[in-house]
Amino acid sequence: MDLFFDLLRSVIYGVIEGITEWLPISSTGHMILAEQVLKFSFSAEFMEMFRVVIQLGAILAVVVMYFKKLWPFCVDNGRDSGLAKHVRWPVMRLWFKIIVACLPAAVLGLALDDWIDAHFYNSVVVAVMLIAYGIAFILIERRPRVPTTTKLSRITYRQALLVGAWQVLALIPGTSRSGSTIIGGLLCGMSRACASQFTFFLAIPVMAGASGLKLVKFLAGGGVFTVGEIGALLVGCIVAFVVSILAIRFLMDYVKKHTFTAFGWYRIALGIVVLGVWALQTFVLA
């Protein structure tokens, strides 16, 4: 019976991950609230790894949806050479820019991962960052602007590096990786659609690396998977994959006609809720 409920909780976690990883509303903020209600029977070490590795399902959704835009090779059926691969240089250049944008967060993330988890993974920090970034979205969208970059192929290395610098801030729980990079893209002159799509692509190496790091640390620390834990992880990843496809389609349709202001107000409201739950547990129920 415990396994059944753990799998059910994994489904809920997968839904939360699939929605909040791509919408700029902070997956961590929602996970903290979910953890107050969804109590797994697994170890704390497994759950720390589970919260991150479940992102693999979300990453796969981006790869599947945008494979043609991301695959840097084309196939030419030549008579003499047979099946020959040729580089699609516009796509390869996009990957170079993605790598440039990922470097700042990759370097600092590797160096500070444990320290950040120990000092910043708490309800107060998450609530403050939810509210701060919510205000930032509202203020940015109120500023009159004309996007100078509307296509991924027009993104410069300077813009990629600046977006990467903003992504560093996403190491702080509650900021939202997609929220940070979208804000960075908007401030660099990208359109909402361009900033959102670039954010999706940045997630592939960043989230794959973060998931791999957590998995290695779990195994290196003596962690051993039980059958129930493997099942929960697979279920969570599959659900995150399916829901991510729906969330990405929704966001790309949404930004064609709307601003990010609604997400800003939602973040502020969620931050207040997280702060309220923390205050209740700390001062009333303690």
Describe each region flagged by the PLM.
Residues 1-286:
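Multi-pass membrane proteins that catalyze or facilitate reactions on polyprenyl-/lipid-phosphate substrates
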